[in-house]
């Protein structure tokens, strides 16, 4: 929605009037410029949305003893009438609300894609949706979208080239070997620092590579790796051998990784080091070069947690055959892109990760997958459209008033607590003042104009 400046409007009218008065009587009137085409307003068809799940006393099962099995007494009839859908691994009220939200988003995306006059965020959403839903083009392209990346991997013949590839992929958010992000400094929360933590495994955690009771999953993963490589054109026998290589490669990473139990200890994520100290720990991987490639200033300090993992990666850069690195990197490049490639890649990705690992019976419909990706990459852009139809400004204003009243009441209670000292009250009020309500959506949206 645009707003007009009254002073600017008045000035414009005055200029128009002056120009008109100065015209010669015989001047022909100038044709008005055609109005710019406007995007259509977004609408919502409630009739196409899933019905909300509403509690009814008839849902209670009098045939079940509430004191014996309260869950069956309250939820048994509902669960019997609402089996888990084939494209889900769980089902409940939150999932139903999620389905409704997706249905709303679908309507918005379809409208944005169909509107040739859409601009800004609406155009971004419409283009994203149209691209993701163009199955014919996706099938025709096959693996072509990632061929340049695969060609780059095929050219990795030494330690320096492999380290350079890792740096390059990290710079575009696709680090194949470790996780890298910025978070608050554990010891000084007023500033953020970089954290480089373990990664690189295709299975959920290190136990999948060693525990006997998970051997069937490891075998299925090996078969999945071979199949993915086959789909890229690798001969079956070569794909099977490369799959063994990838498993051996990841097993070595797993042995140097912390367990899920260890990862619960937040302190293990904090290992502040200087660039010089980090480079000394990983002689085959320069952190100085890494930060340069990320287009950020060299930090005085960053956190290098799980040092044994990073040291092992450095050793592998030096002692592992580049062919093994190529097999590992090639598989993960294709596997990571598989959900967005042609159907044979999508199906193979689903068969292992969703069906084998998590028991999901059916793949989600394409429109749901496209929305899932859209929300992951540009969720705030979709949110900007979503609130126009699902949470308008007057709803936000009412909630802000409600929360404001609660804050005022809380402050009053603190000030009138008889058992709290004046000094403690001052500290409590200081903490109260730091509370920033965030309701519905931000007052200032992220600027997506650079993508338009």
What residues fall within each predicted segment?
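Contiguous, non-catalytic segments that form substrate-binding/exosite surfaces or channel walls
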Residues: 233, 254, 397-452
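Bacterial lipoprotein signal-peptidase II cleavage site
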Residues: 22-32
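Bacterial N-terminal signal peptides that target proteins for export
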Residues: 1-10
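Bacterial N-terminal signal peptides
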Residues: 10-18
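Noncatalytic, helix-rich "gating/capping" subdomain that lines the substrate-entry/channel surface
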Residues: 111-401, 405
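Extracytoplasmic/secreted envelope proteins and their assembly/folding machinery
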Residues: 57, 64-67, 71, 75, ...
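N-terminal low-complexity, Pro/Thr/Ser-rich intrinsically disordered segments
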Residues: 32-56
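Active-site-surrounding "flap" and adjacent substrate/cofactor-binding loops of secreted or lumenal enzymes
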Residues: 44-51, 65-137
């Amino acid at each position: 929605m645009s707003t007009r400046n009254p002073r600017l409007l008045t000035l414009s009218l005055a200029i128009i009037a002056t120009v008109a008065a100065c015209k010669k009587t015989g001047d022909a009137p100038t044709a008005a410029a055609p109005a710019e085409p406007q995007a259509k307003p977004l609408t919502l068809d409630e009739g196409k949305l899933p019905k909300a799940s509403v509690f009814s006393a008839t849902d209670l099962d009098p045939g079940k003893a509430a004191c014996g099995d309260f869950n069956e007494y309250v939820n048994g009839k509902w669960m019997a009438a609402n089996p888990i859908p084939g494209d889900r691994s769980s089902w409940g009220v939150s999932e139903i609300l999620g389905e409704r939200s997706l249905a709303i988003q679908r309507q918005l995306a379809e409208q944005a894609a169909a509107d040739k006059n859409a601009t800004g965020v609406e155009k971004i959403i419409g283009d994203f949706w149209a691209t993701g839903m163009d199955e014919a083009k996706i099938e025709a392209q096959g693996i072509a979208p990632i061929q340049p990346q695969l060609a780059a991997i095929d050219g990795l013949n030494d330690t320096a080239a492999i380290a350079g590839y890792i740096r390059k992929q990290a710079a575009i958010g696709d680090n194949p070997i470790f996780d890298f992000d910025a978070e608050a400094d554990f010891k000084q929360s007023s500033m953020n620092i970089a954290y480089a933590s373990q990664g690189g495994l295709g299975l959920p955690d290190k136990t999948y590579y060693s525990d006997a009771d998970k051997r069937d999953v490891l075998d299925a993963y090996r078969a999945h790796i071979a199949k993915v490589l086959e789909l890229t054109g690798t001969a079956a026998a070569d794909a099977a051998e490369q799959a063994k290589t990838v498993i051996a490669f990841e097993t070595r990473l797993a042995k140097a990784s912390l367990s899920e139990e260890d990862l619960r200890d937040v302190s293990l994520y904090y290992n502040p080091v200087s660039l010089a100290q980090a480079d000394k720990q990983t002689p085959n991987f320069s952190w100085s070069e890494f930060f340069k490639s990320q287009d950020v200033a060299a930090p005085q300090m960053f956190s290098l947690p799980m040092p044994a993992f990073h040291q092992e990666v450095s050793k592998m850069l030096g002692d592992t055959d580049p062919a093994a690195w190529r097999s590992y990197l090639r598989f993960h490049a294709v596997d990571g892109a598989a959900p967005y490639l042609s159907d044979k890649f999508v199906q193979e990705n689903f068969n292992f990760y969703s069906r084998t690992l998590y028991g999901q019976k059916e793949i989600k419909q394409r429109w749901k997958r496209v929305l899932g990706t859209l929300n992951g990459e540009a969720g705030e852009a979709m949110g900007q459209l979503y609130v126009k139809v699902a949470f308008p400004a007057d709803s936000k204003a009412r909630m802000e008033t409600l929360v404001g009243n609660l804050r005022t009441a809380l402050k009053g209670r603190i000030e009138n607590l008889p058992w709290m000292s004046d000094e403690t009250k001052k500290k409590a009020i200081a903490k109260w003042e730091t509370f920033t309500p965030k309701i519905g959506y931000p007052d200032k949206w992220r600027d997506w104009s650079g993508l338009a």
